[in-house]
């Protein structure tokens, strides 16, 4: 079993999945993974399917040189965005793998949240392209490693109510007006 860069906070309520040397662009995958980080699992799967159908875009924040603008990026507070279909496919496969791992461990799949997702660069693959005058240039690819940790969301426990209600704070101005009103009557 490979090492993960981070251990889950509660290992009994978490599950992991990872992929190594995946033939998908690192930069696109990093931006897509950053977008779905901390999302509930159901929302992340829906988002990635929407990206494939170009209904929602992935905002490009770091690797955004030459990236065009789109109106769908406004909901993320930026102007540049794309629809990286292959990255969405790979992340969907990984999330489905992690979900089946969670199901195997007996976790509630409806309460899963993406606690940690990380994309690292893998060794570049070298090919060649033939140029004019007998020259050869490199034709490199940028694969990546992806790891994801899903955790069950903790249930929020409501505080017990106290018997006496909290006193409403009144500003000095309003207090002075109220006293003035009482003196007039």
Swiss-Prot record:
GO terms for biological process: cytoplasmic translation. PANTHER family: 60S RIBOSOMAL PROTEIN L17. Keywords: Ribonucleoprotein, Ribosomal protein. Residues 167-176 have a biased composition (Basic residues). One of its GO terms (cellular component) is cytosolic large ribosomal subunit. The keyword Ribonucleoprotein applies. The gene is RpL17. Residues 158-185 are annotated as: Disordered. The keyword Phosphoprotein does not apply. InterPro entries: Ribosomal_uL22, Ribosomal_uL22_CS, Ribosomal_uL22_euk/arc, Ribosomal_uL22_sf. Belongs to the universal ribosomal protein uL22 family. This is Large ribosomal subunit protein uL22.
């Amino acid at each position: 079993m490979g090492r993960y860069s981070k251990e889950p906070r509660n290992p009994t309520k978490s599950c992991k999945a990872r992929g190594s040397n995946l033939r998908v662009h690192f930069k696109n995958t990093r931006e897509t993974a950053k977008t779905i980080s901390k999302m509930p699992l159901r929302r992340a799967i829906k988002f990635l399917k929407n990206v494939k159908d170009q209904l929602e875009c992935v905002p490009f924040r770091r690797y955004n040189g030459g990236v065009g603008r789109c109106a769908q990026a406004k909901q993320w507070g930026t102007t540049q965005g794309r629809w990286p279909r292959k990255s969405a496919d790979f992340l969907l496969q990984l999330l489905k793998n992690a979900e089946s791992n969670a199901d195997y461990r007996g976790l509630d799949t409806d309460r899963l949240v993406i606690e940690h997702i990380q994309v690292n660069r893998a060794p570049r693959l070298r090919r060649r392209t033939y140029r004019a005058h007998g020259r050869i240039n490199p034709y490199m690819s940028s694969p990546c490693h992806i790891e994801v940790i899903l955790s069950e969301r903790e249930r929020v426990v409501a505080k017990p109510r106290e018997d006496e209600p909290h006193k409403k704070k009144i500003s000095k101005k309003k207090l002075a007006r109220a006293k003035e009103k009482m003196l007039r009557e």
